[in-house]
Amino acid sequence: YILGVDIGREYLRVAIFNLKNEPIEGILEYSSILEEQDDEATLRYVREKIDETIGRLNVDRAKIKVAGFALPGLIDREGTSYTYLTYEHPGIKGILEEMLQIPVFIDNDSNVMAMAEHTFGVAKDVNNVLCVSVNECIGLGMILNSKLYRGGIGMAGEFGHIRISGLEASCH
């Protein structure tokens, strides 16, 4: 099985897929505490919801071989997050691998969306794809010549939000 986790600022989505990329059941959605708690509390909550999902779906944990995580914000090629869950060593990827005891892939939510659409979705047979994510911030996942484009430092397409002079807005 494959564990998929989408950690948003307002939601936490957890799903388990078979090797044909079919969800065992629908994607389970929980409220998110990403901005309400410190990193340790957030990770405990994520672990609790992963465990709850595994139990609800009656899946043998030993059969889950890999996990994929999507996070908002700036994430580099090595899976280090600079916006949320900003652990320095071993980084959020390493912490999740220690927590779950399986390999973890982690990327920006817009990149994950672009890769999913290019691999399984409406852009399956398209070489160049732009996927725009508009939530609290704006993100862009780019597939160019059938490859995810990351840019020079691995964070291409993540706009976040742009401050406009005279308007008050909190930065995330």
Regions found by a protein language model. Name each.
Residues 26, 30-121, 125-128:
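Glycine-rich phosphate-binding loop and adjoining helix at the ATP-binding site
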Residues 9, 108-110, 154:
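Short beta->alpha linker loops
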Residues 12, 80-81, 169:
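Hydrophobic residues embedded in beta-strands of well-ordered beta-sheets
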